[in-house]
From Swiss-Prot:
The lineage of its organism: Bacteria, Bacillati, Chloroflexota, Chloroflexia, Chloroflexales. One of its GO terms (molecular function) is ribonucleoside binding. The RNAP catalytic core consists of 2 alpha, 1 beta, 1 beta' and 1 omega subunit. When a sigma factor is associated with the core the holoenzyme is formed, which can initiate transcription. The keyword Oxidoreductase does not apply. The keyword Nucleotidyltransferase applies. It holds the Pfam family RNA_pol_Rpb2_6. This is DNA-directed RNA polymerase subunit beta. It comes from Chloroflexus aurantiacus (strain ATCC 29366 / DSM 635 / J-10-fl). InterPro entries: DNA-dir_RNA_pol_bsu_external_1, DNA-dir_RNA_pol_su2, DNA-dir_RNAP_su2_dom, DNA-dir_RNAP_su2_hyb_sf, RNA_pol_bsu_bac, RNA_pol_bsu_CS, RNA_pol_bsu_protrusion, RNA_pol_Rpb2_2. DNA-dependent RNA polymerase catalyzes the transcription of DNA into RNA using the four ribonucleoside triphosphates as substrates. Belongs to the RNA polymerase beta chain family.
């Protein structure tokens, strides 16, 4: 026998808090971190995108909309004017808890102050209008809509602006460029160049026209700098838009004699001046309408220059200015329009044509549409604003119509405004939009990821069928903004992404990521004075102490303080020489002290070059800003003064990875994990996993079901606490204070200002995915808490940390083929000790409605039901709490009237004498579905008579919650965090499991063959480190890209008294013999996923049939059959199993008469008759006949066989035997 290894016992890693420990701090799991790089900044609140965006909408978004629509005038513009003034949100009628329980929407009343001006008399009528109940976001970034929690997912779309694209001409291979001008709202302009050098334009996707027609026409529009403008008078129109004027506009760019773009286009242009161009443009855009100057001018104005019809939005103007006015193409000193100008200016269009000619001539570069500088995020607030705008525009139409119908003197704001279009628009958005999603609540991580998701689908976005490879691919601009790993597998791959850990959305909607500023030089006094006012805090480069605050006005003294403060302690990169006297003040390499700094400040030098130092200042850069800078990675080695140790470092510049001298570096990453999303940053040793498996790992963590006793991972990454805290499933203290009382249902904290705050806990609530949400206090009485501390754990958290699975002892070895093809063998201990047991809660509802024949009734008095079936029902006919139910048990007794039957004369006489109505009812009770069993944990009854808000025609609703405890069993799916997934093939008795030399059996056996080809080595390192850490009694944090090294793990294994290679000899539990080779053993974190066998297993003997094909329905929900497909038929043919095959094609499928006779024969124990003709064969005959072929069926003696066409007569001949167990016609 080898030397025995001591038993590995997981002790509680944190001592429990003594209930009397007054003033003790909140409990947190302590982790030993392997990180070498400290994050430069703390993680932001992970759901701040949602919260900030909705706050913006409430504060500014609504204001913008009301300003946009005001004033609404009548069609003449002379009688009435309606102005929307200020607005307020009232208090919600019910809180979130009540809304969830009663299936209501958590909403606040929106009221608007409206002013109606009667222009003829000058009278003003004011009133406050109720604009409907507006859904309000909860503190967790969700909406409670009709009782269910929903999330509005941010949308990633192409930003408004102008985009230039290179298209190869197929015959010559010449580069011909196109330009697209995309507004936020309004007509698109698409410019193209053909091989004959003609530049054409499509206005609003109509016909192509030579661009000079548009150019001539807009020369007559005189635009002001603020975007307003006017047309020149009719009598002067002939003076504008002549050929020489157009040629003059582009003389400086159209310089290649072989390709005279403007001349070639003018040759194709039938018009000669602005007047003709306007009429020609109108003819092309509105063929069939009589062209008049008035019509032409108003059409062009409304298409391009009217703020009501055309809106670039602030972001569109920003992109337009960046692309047209900041490109270093020509320096004519022209100033870019202001960002407040949200319509087109004629000079924008001239500039686009200029740019197009330059690109065709080989100057400049086209745009990359997949670059994140060209894609922006529409967050919740903007999406709701857009939908609210739709509602307001519908409301405007109604108001205008009513204005024209009503007498102006008697009109009132209430009489003109109908809020229904606004309410309907919001209902449409929250209930039906592709971006308003039923929240994934499987576990806290699923909830958090759902809120941080970015979708390229949805209205105005891409469609998954037409999206190509490029748009789905990882792009260099995703770095630090969109996770390159986490995206769904399947048709949505690359179209749905997740924000990286540190990413945020700026006010333009572009994704930004933070970087630490690197100082290569320090500005001297005169430069600081020129800046005037500080736009940011200035901090000491060594200590991070504040030198001068943002907003400070810079004078001589402050400029001196700033420069001296920045220079102190830095090392000069070059000699400092007095320019006046040529005196050497200090040599390169000198460390600057205060005295030297004060001398340097007096010199007339603008910039003092220092050895590069990484400051504490953090700048958030968008993707197009980042492309201008050289950025070094977070793992570049620094000394204690934050100076680089190497002279050449690995950097990123644009899309290239380059090695640069440190003097050229502008910024440094703030953290190694800023590249990936929260879900991916929870995978330890991510750097050792193949990307495909890491993708599966981050997706599968979201599917982990909450277990009975959550257990935080031994090997974590340090992100577990923040992920759980920001998810919204745990309760976080709002302010500092001391816990006054704690029960399983509420926690009361006395805050430092003397106020008491009560926190309600969610107990055994059903989540959207039928998992159980149950909050448990994580604090004790007398304990001191700080704002932001977790005070109550949820279903998948342990002491405030995310705990999605369990730490189990795994062995990597084949075992009797039981773990072939990724299957997993588990020990019975996991079943017996409820290690992987989860709780699931299902909701069943029944409504008692008014029918044409009378009201339905919830009652215990159900026809043809024995006492045994009623044993668990109370006197109302509703099951009592605590009852254990099986499939087909009655949950709620309900009867529905069937209508009067025809009575005989005698019965009519009896009814007339005794006054009783012949009333027949049918049993329509709510029963437990097939395959479901569990315990009733809650019953809620909502009655109209008691004031409940119910849908029209519903008198009463009863809701029953059924709870199931599911232990791990064969067929359940399990996975690790590295994409190592498999199905449990067998639950082995503990005594049969392989055991360690100390007699301890392993919990799970995984197949080692699943590792090399998948290249997810992270699981092996996790197993080794987990074993050592469990043995030494602590938990570890090994952050992504900055985790434990192999030698560190080996050292820990040795320290724990374990073999350095992490392998040990195992013994067969059945025979006690040792296995031939040592086996890798250790602690791995395994998850039980939501794909549970109990939800999937299904069997059918008879059941419903499709009315069209008469074949069994498919799927578990329909109680359907299993498809016996083409390949299965081949198998039976190969074996010559003729009778089995015939049964499959006839009585088990669509031979209507045959299947009933077969059923009858089986029940009566008689021999089964020969099969009949299947329905599909009859269809085939009819199809051939419909093609004009005379096809008929002949018997063995060649006589025609009559096939019945009438299904009803077939069924009528069956004397009421019904196989389906359903009323005919239900399917």
């Amino acid at each position: 026998m080898p030397p025995l290894i001591e038993s590995v016992v997981l002790q509680p890693l944190i001592a429990p808090i003594d209930p009397g420990a007054d003033g003790r701090r909140s409990r947190r799991i302590e982790r030993r971190s392997f990180a070498r790089i400290k994050d430069a900044i703390d993680l932001p609140l992970l759901i701040e995108t949602q919260l900030k965006s909705f706050e913006w909408f409430k504060r500014e978004g609504l204001r913008e909309l009301f300003d946009e629509i005001s004033p609404i005038t009548d069609f003449t513009g002379k009688n009435l004017e309606l102005h929307f003034r200020d607005y307020t949100f009232g208090e919600p009628r019910y809180d979130e808890f009540e809304c969830r329980e009663r299936d209501l929407t958590y909403a606040a009343p929106l009221r608007v102050r409206v002013e109606l001006r009667i222009l003829t008399t000058g009278e003003i009528k004011e009133s406050e209008i109720f604009l409907g109940d507006f859904p309000i976001m909860t503190d967790n970034g969700t909406f409670v809509y009709n009782g269910a929690e929903r999330v509005v997912v941010s949308q990633l779309i192409r930003s408004p602006g102008v985009y230039f694209k290179d298209e190869k001409e197929p015959t010559s291979g010449r580069s011909l460029h196109t330009a697209k001008l995309i507004p936020n709202r309004g007509a698109w302009l698409e410019f193209e160049t053909n091989k004959r050098d003609v530049i054409s334009v499509k206005v609003d996707r109509k016909r192509k026209i030579p661009v000079t027609i548009l150019l001539r026409a807009i020369t007559a529009w005189i635009a002001e700098e603020n975007g307003n403008g006017r047309w020149v008078p009719d009598n002067e129109l002939d003076k504008f838009g002549h050929n020489d004027q157009i040629i003059e506009l582009f003389r400086h760019v159209d310089t290649v004699p072989e390709h005279p773009y403007i001349h070639a286009t003018l040759d194709k242009d039938p018009s000669r001046n602005a007047k003709e161009a306007l009429l020609e443009l109108y003819k092309r855009l509105r063929p069939g309408d009589p062209p008049t100057l008035e019509n032409a001018r108003s059409l062009i104005e409304s298409l391009l220059f009217s703020p009501r019809r055309y809106d670039l939005a602030k972001v569109g103007r920003y992109k337009l200015n960046k692309n047209l006015w900041e490109r270093d193409v020509r320096r004519d000193g022209a100033k870019a329009p202001d960002l407040s100008v949200r319509v087109l200016l004629p000079r924008d269009i001239f500039r686009i044509v200029e740019q197009l000619i330059l690109l065709n001539n080989g100057h400049g570069r086209p745009d990359d549409i997949d670059h994140l500088g060209n894609r922006r995020v529409r967050t919740v607030g903007e999406l709701i604003q857009q939908q609210f705008r739709v509602g307001l525009l519908r409301l405007e139409r109604v108001v205008k119509e009513r204005m024209s119908l009503q007498d102006p003197a008697s009109a009132t704001p209430n009489g003109l405004i109908n809020i229904r279009p606004v309410v309907a628009a919001m209902r449409e958005f929250f209930g039906g939009s592709q971006l308003s999603q039923f929240m994934d609540q499987t576990n806290p991580l699923a909830e958090l990821t759902n809120k941080r998701r970015l979708s390229a689908l949805g209205p105005g976005g891409l469609s998954r069928d037409r999206a190509g490879f490029e748009v789905r691919d990882v792009h260099h601009s995703h770095y630090g903004r969109i996770c390159p790993v986490e995206t769904p597998e399947g048709p949505n791959i690359g179209l749905i992404g997740t924000m990286s850990t540190f990413a945020r959305v700026n006010e333009m909607g572009f994704l930004e990521t933070p970087y630490r500023k690197v100082y290569n030089s320090v500005d001297n006094v005169q430069v600081w004075k020129e800046k005037g006012i500080l736009l940011r805090d200035v901090r000491d480069l060594r200590t991070g102490d504040l030198i001068a605050a943002k907003g400070t006005r810079v004078n001589d003294e402050i400029a001196r303080q700033i420069t001296i403060g920045l220079l102190r302690g830095q090392i000069l990169r070059e000699d400092i020489v007095d320019p006046d006297t040529d005196e050497l003040i200090a040599e390169a390499g000198t460390e600057i002290n205060r005295a030297l700094a004060e001398r340097i400040v007096e010199l007339p030098i603008k910039h003092i070059k220092i050895r590069p130092v990484v400051s504490q200042e953090v700048d958030y850069l968008s993707a197009d800003e980042e492309d201008r800078f050289v950025i070094v990675q977070a793992n570049a080695p620094l000394d204690q003064h934050n100076r680089f140790l190497d002279t050449i470092v690995s950097c990123r510049f644009g899309e290239d990875f380059v090695s640069e001298r440190v003097e050229r570096v502008d910024y440094m990453d703030v953290s190694p994990k800023q590249v990936v999303s929260v879900s991916t940053s929870l995978i330890p040793f991510l750097e050792h996993d193949d990307a495909n498996r890491a993708l599966m790992g981050s997706n599968m963590q979201r599917q982990a079901v909450p277990l009975l006793r959550p257990d935080a991972p031994i090997v974590g990454t340090g992100m577990e606490y923040r992920a759980a805290r920001d998810s919204g499933q745990v309760i976080v203290a709002r302010r500092d204070g001391v816990v006054v009382s704690t029960t399983s249902e509420r926690i009361v904290i006395e805050e430092d200002d003397g106020n008491q705050t009560e926190y309600r806990l969610r107990k055994f609530m059903r989540s959207n995915q039928d998992t159980c949400i149950n909050q448990r206090p994580a604090v004790v009485r007398g304990q001191r808490v700080k704002a932001g501390d977790v005070i109550a754990d949820s279903s998948s958290t342990d002491q405030g940390e995310l705990a999605l699975g369990q730490n189990v002892l795994v062995a990597y070895m084949p075992w009797e083929g039981g773990n072939f093809e990724d299957a997993i063998l588990v020990s019975e201990r996991l079943v017996r000790e409820d290690i992987f047991t989860s709780i699931h809660i299902e909701k069943y509802e029944v409504e008692a409605r008014d029918t044409k024949l009378g009201p339905e009734e919830i009652t215990r008095d159900i026809p043809n039901v024995g006492q045994e079936s009623l044993r668990n029902l109370d006197e109302r006919g509703i099951i009592y709490i605590g009852a254990e139910v099986q499939p087909n048990d009655i949950l709620v007794g309900k009867i529905t009237p069937k209508g009067e039957t025809d009575l005989t004369a005698e019965e009519r006489l009896l009814r007339a004498i005794f006054g009783e109505k012949a009333r027949e009812v049918k049993d329509s009770s709510l029963r437990v579905p097939n395959g479901v069993r569990g315990k009733v944990i809650d019953v809620k009854v909502f009655s109209r008579s008691e004031g409940a808000e119910l849908p029209v025609g519903v008198n009463q609703t009863v809701r029953v919650l059924l709870c199931q405890k599911r232990k791990i069993s064969a067929g359940d799916k399990m996975a690790g965090r590295h994409g190592n997934k498999g199905v449990v093939s067998r639950v082995l008795p503990i005594e049969d499991m392989p055991f360690l030399p100390d007699g301890r059996p392993v919990d799970i056996i995984l197949n080692p063959i699943g590792v090399p080809s998948r290249m997810n080595i992270g699981q092996i390192l996790e197993t080794h480190l987990g074993w050592a850490a469990a043995r030494l009694g602590f938990r570890v944090a090994t952050p992504v890209f900055d985790g434990a090294h192999e030698d560190q793990i080996k050292d820990l294994l040795v320290q724990a008294g374990l073999p350095a290679d992490g392998k040990v000899t195992l013994y067969d539990g059945r025979t006690g013999e040792r296995f031939d080779n040592p086996v890798t053993v250790g602690y791995a974190y395994m998850l039980k996923l939501a794909h549970l066998v109990e939800d999937k297993i299904h069997a059918r003997s008879t059941g419903p049939y499709s009315l069209v094909t008469q074949q069994p329905l498919g799927g578990k929900a329909q109680f359907g059959g299993q498809r016996f497909g083409e390949m299965e038929v081949w198998a039976l043919e190969a074996y010559g199993a003729a009778y089995t095959l015939q049964e499959m094609l006839t009585v088990k499928s669509d031979d209507v008469v045959g299947r009933v006779k077969t059923y009858e024969a089986i029940v009566k124990g008689e021999p089964i008759q020969e099969a009949g003709v299947p329905e599909s064969f009859k269809v085939l005959i009819k199809e051939l006949q419909s093609l004009g072929l005379s096809v008929e069926v002949l018997s063995a003696d060649e006589k025609p066989v009559e096939l019945s066409d009438d299904l009803d007569s077939d069924i009528g001949a069956l004397e009421g035997i019904n196989l389906s167990g359903m009323e005919r016609g239900e399917f």
